[in-house]
C-alpha cells in the first residue's frame, strides 16, 4: 500500500537521536502554532490554553490522590521521550517512518492532558488561586521567551498575542469559578470562551495548512469526479 502513498517503502534507521528541542515542543502547545505536516514537522499537541493553566493545578491539588498524580506525570514524561527519541517514535509508527503527518499518536497525549485538566477544574474550589496566578504569569514569561526565538511559524499576533490574551481571559474567568460567584454562569462563560478559542485556532490552522501544502479547491475536485463518474 505504500506504493500508492507520498513515497515508496524506504529503509528505516533506528538511531537514538533527538528529534527536536524541548522549547520547540513547548511552543506547539499554544494556539496559532501551526508549522508543517511535512517530515520535518513537530507534534501537534495544542489542546487549549485553559488546559495549560489547569495542568499544573492538577499536580498541586491534594484532593487528587498522589499516586494518580505521580503516574500521570510519569506517563506525560514517557510520551515526551517517545516523541523526542527517533528510534522509539519509529516503533510507534509500526517500525516505519511516516510519510508526512508525524507523531500520529499525539492525540493520546492530548486526551491525557484534557482528562487531567478536567480533574483540576473539578477541584478548583479547593485550590489556592495564587497558584493559578503564578501559572498564568509563568505562561506569559514562556510566551515572551518563545517570541524571542523568532520561529518562522510563531506569529507575533496570531500566536503570542492571542495566547497572552487567552491566558489573561481564562485567568479571570477561573477566578469567578473559584470564588463561587455566579458559579453556573461563570462555568458557562468558560465553555463559551473555550469554543471561541478553539474556533479561532482551527481557523488559523486551516489557513496555515493551505499556505503549507495548499487545500484543493472544490472546482478541481469536481472536475476530477466528472471524469470518473459513469
Language model features: what each stretch is:
Residues 201, 229-230:
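Short periplasmic/luminal acceptor-recognition loop of GT-C membrane glycosyltransferases, typified by
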Residues 73-81, 85-87, 96-223:
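Contiguous transmembrane helix-bundle modules in multi-pass membrane proteins
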Residues 1-71, 78-79, 85-93, 98-107, ...:
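Periplasmic/ER-lumenal interhelical loops and adjacent helix-loop junctions
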Amino acid at each position: 500500500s505504500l506504493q500508492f502513498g507520498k513515497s515508496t517503502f524506504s529503509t528505516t534507521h533506528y538511531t537514538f537521536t533527538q528529534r527536536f528541542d524541548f522549547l520547540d515542543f513547548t511552543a506547539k502547545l499554544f494556539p496559532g502554532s501551526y508549522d508543517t505536516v511535512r517530515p520535518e514537522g513537530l507534534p501537534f499537541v495544542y489542546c487549549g490554553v485553559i488546559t495549560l493553566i489547569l495542568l499544573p493545578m492538577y499536580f498541586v491539588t491534594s484532593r487528587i490522590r498522589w499516586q494518580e498524580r505521580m503516574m500521570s506525570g510519569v506517563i506525560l514524561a514517557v510520551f515526551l521521550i517517545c516523541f523526542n527519541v527517533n528510534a522509539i517514535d519509529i516503533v510507534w509508527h509500526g517500525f516505519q517512518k511516516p510519510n508526512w503527518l508525524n507523531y500520529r499518536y499525539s492525540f493520546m497525549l492530548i486526551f491525557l492532558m484534557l482528562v487531567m485538566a478536567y480533574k483540576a477544574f473539578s477541584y478548583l474550589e479547593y485550590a489556592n488561586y495564587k497558584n493559578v496566578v503564578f501559572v498564568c504569569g509563568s505562561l506569559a514569561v514562556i510566551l515572551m521567551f518563545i517570541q524571542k526565538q523568532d520561529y518562522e511559524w510563531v506569529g507575533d499576533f496570531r500566536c503570542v498575542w492571542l495566547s497572552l490574551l487567552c491566558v489573561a481571559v481564562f485567568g479571570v474567568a477561573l477566578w469567578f469559578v473559584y470564588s463561587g460567584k455566579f458559579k453556573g454562569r461563570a462555568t458557562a462563560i468558560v465553555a463559551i470562551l473555550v469554543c471561541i478559542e478553539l474556533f479561532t485556532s482551527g481557523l488559523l490552522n486551516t489557513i496555515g495548512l493551505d499556505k503549507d501544502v495548499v487545500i484543493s479547491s472544490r472546482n478541481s475536485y469536481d472536475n476530477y469526479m466528472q471524469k470518473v463518474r459513469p
